[in-house]
């Protein structure tokens, strides 16, 4: 994979994948965000560099550089400003655009935008260099819209490539777009009306003036307001649901009536605990809390700006306070969200000085009212959290912002327990007490959690999931011994041979794990013979020796918790098993195998964050019903830390009832990993070369594949565990069998198919093999049907990447998976 190097200054350069010897790549695309002179009041440049595009997307991009500052200039310029925006307003006037900026508002063609977070972007219609103006009512809206525009422009450049960045397109598409504006995006203006609601359209000339073309307009807010007006109420004493007429018809109405009763009862139980028996919260809230039931997470994100089981409203004029996507297992999350609304209505967060200075305490207060957390009372999680050494520190719990290494799954019950520990019977009294705590006092309380009763674990859940008539993979591999080692590790759960596909998430709202397009992709995979998928969350590490890990998943375009849970549930609904497989994404052009700390202090810090990351997802894997769990992926430089791995495996076993594996790197982890006997499956990302000869024929590839299979069989027998190919793949490039872990170069579907046919022909289905997960497909490939067909076909046919659907390799994979 091509690496990217983040500079410390205002520019970040990402090199394109290396080509052949002496090959000179194309000039990098330079995207420039020009901020006003004296930007200190708004901090626009700093906010752009703290944004999602700069921090999360740019390191993945191919051939893109971003410049930010008052003198920034590039292939495309974005002039960024905040009302009254003298710089941008002057440019708009000189271009004759229907844009007017006042002290507190931005007007476009007579429409006034003055709400916090709203912003307008317009393209200047003249000049040889494409220039956009982005003006916000406030800095937050301006930066958010500029960030959105950067994603659009980078995608137009074809920079996302295999990263699944967005709407497609490639450099050839851009170059073919002749004329003075090769960066035409299909719209000339874009308005951020709400976090996910946009207005877009094009200019036209009328009587010598530039005006909005009504035929080209798309106005999300107007459409949403029209749809929201059609929603019907299901009234209750304390909670009123809003749902579409179709959803309230037939059996859907009975389901929603049960939901309304549950939520109404939850509010009735929680309200008296806010301020006490004489408080106004004992009376029926006036008006009731209005909750909109969304059809899916994509619609929820468009209406609120984020996704989750239940999230607050964000659009101007919203009738609802909360928007939820219904699943019967998520009632606990709806109760927590309702508790948050009760706290806000009572003014307790503000009165306690809590929001926004202590977000973890705000979450904890809501959970203290709601009670349950991922299937059990929140207090029952505390012994496991303490024993697994994943508790936050006092400083982290009292921090004024949510750190990216923090885990909502793991830390919210701790915050609720801290609230509960305070004197008083009401939330108001407890918040008054917790407000006075210091980090040292919280640390002292946290130290006492280790003395609590042992965690109950998942023994009952494991027994409930077992299928006594099935033959376990471990028994198939070892001739009947389905136990682990002599220390009594858990046996492998009963699973058949896994015909798997590594299903990476496309980083887009419409194509993510949470999106309806996922169902179409799962259908397609099942049709080709797959019966399992792996799902992959990510943590980010800035470099191989950086001790901090940052949990990703902060927005709908990334691998969110709710998206992963939804994907597991949908896979099960389609009859597919799931391998839940956390990855670490390492910056600085590196890869997970390079991760190694410089000293013991850094190792302790890294392991603390890694435990938090893995156990966060182990809880989600259990809750969603995943079938297998991987404790790591290709972390070769950490394998010498055997004790830390042993402790992590033990902690995972207490919450996850299914088989455990580790996705070892093909180049040495099979032999070096010290913990195979503690796991149920030996796992390997199997990118073994089949031949060093670029011109190898079928016979030579078959011999190379036989040698690979012999090595795999030896590893399985040496560790007395079945072996799972956690990844196996070949890119669609010339001579892919010489270095299967690489992509890029000269495209060749034929060589990709030949390599798969050789390996699978030698592999067969021996009893020691638990299955394979082919690398890779994307969750949103079905959503690509909405993209321009010609560009999509060109990209699929010519990209030398690992995708196999729709290529010759699909037939080779389907043939292997059809064998029984």
Regions found by a protein language model. Give the residues of each.
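Solvent-exposed alpha-helical segments and adjacent loops
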Residues: 9-226
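Juxtacatalytic substrate-recognition/specificity segment
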Residues: 78, 235-357, 376
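Acidic/His/Gly-enriched intrinsically disordered linker/tail segments
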Residues: 306, 310-319, 333-334, 352-465
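Aromatic-rich peripheral "rim/lid" segments of glycoside hydrolase catalytic domains that contact
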Residues: 464-465, 470, 490-495, 513, ...
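Substrate-binding cleft and catalytic face of glycoside hydrolase catalytic domains
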Residues: 496-499, 504, 528-547, 561-638, ...
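Surface-exposed, active-site-proximal loop segments in enzymatic domains
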Residues: 510-511, 539-560, 586-606, 696, ...
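Short, acidic/polar
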Residues: 511-525, 607-620, 666-675, 756-762
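Glycoside hydrolase catalytic-domain groove-lining segments
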Residues: 560-561, 566, 573-574, 581, ...
């Amino acid at each position: 994979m091509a690496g990217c190097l983040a500079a410390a200054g205002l520019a970040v350069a990402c090199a394109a994948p290396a080509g052949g010897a002496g090959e000179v790549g194309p000039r990098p695309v330079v995207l420039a965000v020009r901020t006003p002179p004296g930007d200190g009041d708004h901090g626009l440049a700093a906010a752009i560099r703290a944004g999602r595009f700069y921090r999360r997307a740019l390191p993945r991009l191919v051939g893109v550089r971003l410049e930010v500052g008052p003198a920034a200039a590039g292939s495309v310029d974005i002039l960024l400003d905040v009302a009254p925006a003298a710089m941008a307003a002057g440019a708009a006037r000189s271009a004759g655009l229907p844009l007017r900026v006042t002290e507190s508002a931005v007007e476009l063609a007579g429409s006034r935008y003055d709400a916090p977070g709203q912003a307008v972007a317009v393209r200047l219609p003249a000049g040889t260099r494409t220039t956009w103006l982005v003006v916000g009512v406030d800095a937050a809206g301006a930066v958010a819209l500029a960030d959105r525009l950067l994603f659009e422009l980078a995608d137009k450049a074809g920079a996302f490539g295999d990263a699944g960045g967005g709407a497609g397109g490639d450099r050839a598409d851009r170059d073919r777009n002749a004329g003075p504006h090769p960066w035409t995006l299909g719209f000339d203006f874009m308005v951020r009306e709400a976090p996910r609601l946009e207005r877009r359209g094009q200019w036209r000339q009328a009587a010598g003036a530039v005006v909005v073309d009504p035929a080209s307009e798309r106005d999300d807010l107007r459409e949403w307001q029209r749809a929201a007006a059609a929603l019907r109420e299901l009234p209750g004493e304390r909670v009123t649901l809003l749902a579409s007429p179709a959803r309230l018809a037939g059996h859907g109405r009975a389901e929603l009536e049960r939901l309304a009763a549950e939520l109404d009862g939850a509010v009735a139980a929680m309200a008296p605990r806010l301020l006490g028996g004489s408080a106004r919260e004992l009376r029926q809230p006036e008006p009731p809390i209005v909750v909109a039931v969304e059809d899916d997470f994509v619609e929820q994100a468009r209406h609120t700006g984020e996704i989750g089981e239940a999230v607050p409203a964000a659009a101007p004029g919203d009738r609802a306070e909360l928007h939820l996507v219904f699943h019967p297992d998520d009632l606990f999350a709806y109760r927590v969200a309702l508790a948050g609304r009760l706290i806000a209505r009572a003014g307790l967060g503000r009165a306690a000085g809590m929001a926004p200075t202590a977000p973890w305490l705000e979450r904890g207060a809501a959970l203290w009212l709601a009670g349950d957390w991922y299937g059990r009372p929140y207090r029952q999680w505390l012994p496991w959290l303490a024993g697994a050494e994943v508790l936050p520190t006092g400083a982290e719990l009292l921090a004024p912002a949510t750190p990216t290494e923090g885990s909502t799954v793991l830390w919210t019950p701790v915050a609720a327990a801290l609230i509960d520990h305070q004197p008083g019977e009401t939330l108001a009294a407890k918040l008054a007490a917790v407000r006075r705590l210091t980090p040292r006092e919280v640390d002292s309380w946290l130290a006492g959690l280790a003395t609590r009763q042992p965690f109950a674990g998942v023994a009952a859940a494991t027994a409930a999931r077992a299928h006594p008539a099935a033959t376990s993979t471990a028994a198939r591999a070892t001739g009947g011994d389905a136990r682990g080692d002599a220390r009594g590790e858990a046996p492998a759960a009963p699973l058949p041979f896994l015909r798997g596909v590594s299903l990476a998430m496309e980083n887009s709202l419409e194509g993510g794990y949470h999106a309806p397009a996922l169902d179409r992709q799962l259908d397609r995979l099942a049709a080709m013979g797959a019966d399992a998928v792996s799902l992959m969350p990510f943590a980010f590490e800035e470099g191989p020796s950086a001790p901090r890990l940052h949990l990703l998943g902060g927005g709908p375009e990334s691998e969110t918790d709710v998206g992963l849970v939804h994907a597991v549930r949908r896979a099960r609904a389609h009859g597919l098993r799931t391998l839940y497989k956390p990855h670490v994404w390492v910056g600085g052009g590196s890869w997970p195998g390079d991760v190694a700390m410089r000293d013991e202090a850094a190792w302790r810090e890294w392991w603390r964050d890694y435990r938090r990351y893995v156990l966060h997802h182990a809880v989600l894997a259990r809750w969603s019903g995943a079938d297998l769990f991987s404790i790591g992926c290709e972390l070769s430089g950490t394998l010498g830390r055997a004790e830390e791995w042993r402790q992590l495996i033990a902690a995972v076993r207490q919450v996850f009832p299914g088989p455990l594996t580790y996705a070892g790197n093909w180049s040495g982890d099979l032999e070096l990993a010290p913990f195979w006997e503690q796991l149920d499956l030996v796992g390997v990302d199997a990118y073994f070369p089949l031949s060093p000869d670029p011109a190898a024929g079928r016979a030579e590839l078959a011999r190379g594949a036989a040698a690979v299979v012999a090595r795999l069989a030896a590893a399985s027998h040496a560790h007395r565990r079945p072996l799972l190919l956690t990844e196996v793949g070949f890119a669609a490039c010339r001579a892919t069998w010489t270095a299967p872990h690489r992509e890029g170069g000269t495209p060749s579907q034929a060589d990709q198919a030949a390599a798969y046919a050789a390996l699978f022909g030698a592999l067969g289905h021996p009893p020691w093999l638990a299955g394979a997960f082919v690398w890779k497909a994307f969750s949103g490939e079905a959503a690509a049907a909405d993209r321009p067909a010609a560009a999509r076909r060109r990209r699929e046919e010519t990209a030398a990447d690992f995708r196999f659907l729709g290529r010759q390799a699909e037939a080779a994979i389907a043939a292997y998976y059809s064998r029984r």
